[in-house]
């Protein structure tokens, strides 16, 4: 059992644009692998105007995770051209936890956030 009072909290920050084919594989697995730690883990997914159905897929499949705060989903069309630093900084601003970890859409965290 993890003592959550002393454990730093972690935010996995994912930035995405038109990578539904990748996030469909990784996000459900990452959420499941870390579900028992959701008091200290959050996932932040920032969608920069995807046109491949990502927004609908998230809405259809992750209502519970979004309501609970385990998954934060943010959609914006403000970034016309992809810029990795802007994307990551946007996700970091939305994250609430002590440790911020950048994930690409095709990255897996492993069980327990890799701890």
Which residues does each predicted region cover?
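Short beta-strand/loop segment that forms part of the nucleotide-sugar
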Residues: 39-49, 74-77
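Short alpha-helix within the catalytic core of nucleotide-sugar-dependent glycosyltransferases
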Residues: 27-28, 55, 97, 111-115
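Glycine-rich, basic loop-to-helix element that forms the pyrophosphate-binding segment
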Residues: 78-95
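Short, aromatic/basic amphipathic alpha-helical patches
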Residues: 56-64
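A conserved acidic beta->alpha catalytic loop
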Residues: 47-57, 104-107
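Short aromatic/hydrophobic "clamp" motif used to bind/position activated sugar donors
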Residues: 100
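Short, acidic, metal-binding catalytic loop of nucleotide-sugar glycosyltransferases
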Residues: 28-40
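A conserved hydrophobic helix/loop-capping motif in glycosyltransferases and polysaccharide synthases
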Residues: 10-22, 26, 33, 46
């Amino acid at each position: 059992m993890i003592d959550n009072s002393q454990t730093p909290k972690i935010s996995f920050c994912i930035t995405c644009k038109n990578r539904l084919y990748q996030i469909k594989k990784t996000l459900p697995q990452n959420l499941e692998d870390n579900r028992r730690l959701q008091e200290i883990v959050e996932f932040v997914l920032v969608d920069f105007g995807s046109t491949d159905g990502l927004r609908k897929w998230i809405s259809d499949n992750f209502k519970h995770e979004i309501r609970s705060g385990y998954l934060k989903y943010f959609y914006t069309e403000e970034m016309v051209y992809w810029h990795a630093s802007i994307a990551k900084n946007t996700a970091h601003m939305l994250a609430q936890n002590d440790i911020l970890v950048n994930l690409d859409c095709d990255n897996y965290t492993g069980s327990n956030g890799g701890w």
